[in-house]
């Protein structure tokens, strides 16, 4: 789930 946060970068 946390990976979704960096996927934006």
From Swiss-Prot:
Myoactive. Belongs to the FARP (FMRFamide related peptide) family. Keywords: Amidation, Neuropeptide, Secreted. It is found in: Secreted. The modification Phenylalanine amide is found at residue 9. GO terms for cellular component: extracellular region. GO terms for biological process: neuropeptide signaling pathway. This is FMRFamide-like neuropeptide PF5.
């Amino acid at each position: 789930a946390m990976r979704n946060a960096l996927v934006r970068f």
